Amino acid sequence: MLFRSPSTFPAALQDVDRVFLMRPPHLGDPKALKPLIDALQKQKRIQLVSFLSLLGVEKNPIPPHHKIEQYIEQAGLPYCHIRPGFFMQNISGVHAFEIQHFNRIVVPVRNALTSFIDAQDIGELTARVLCEAHMHQNTSYSITGAEAIDYWEVAEILSQELGRNIVYANPKPSFAKNYWISVRGLEKEYCKVMGMLYMMTRFKGAEKVTTDFEAVMHKKPKSFRQFVRDNAAAWQL
């Protein structure tokens, strides 16, 4: 199914009654998802749309997630917005290159705190929500780790677990964005959204710690230290 090709919707949605919706990183315009949401509204049998949103987005109209949540609710679809903090996988994914090659973390948030969450924990919670659709209709869950840490602490944990000195570069936002585009070759639209999210973090938009994960899953979310231990190979050459 292609978001920009409504002709692909009917076959993909045949016999579907529950939907997990995630905005592709390269689609910064929320209107790109509107045709699919309209198609879901016409299905008449959708029990739940679980949208992977963003922590704090209900109070922040700037990220595209805010408008997408509104589209879903305005369509009258039964929804469960999953609003996670920053994925731990950001450190083992898009930012792993600098750690592998230069032992540096290039993220422009100064000393701001982040309540990292493992994507695996998000996946488990989302699966439960979809399986228990009627128990989670018209709800929202803010999903975070059990603690908020800054990137100096991230660097310290990486150093301790990987056995080498990792430092936090603490770049300016303009430098980081130019680096991602010019040196890393990342897509401009992707870097625009990433820069916007880190600007939110810079102004304390990612430090909130919640207990929603534990309330739904009846266990604690994975710690960042355990995540590093489980994924140490991600930062090795």
Feature names for model-found ranges:
Residues 14, 25-34, 38-48, 54-167, ...:
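Oxidoreductase cofactor-interface core, primarily capturing Rossmann-like NAD(P)-dependent enzymes
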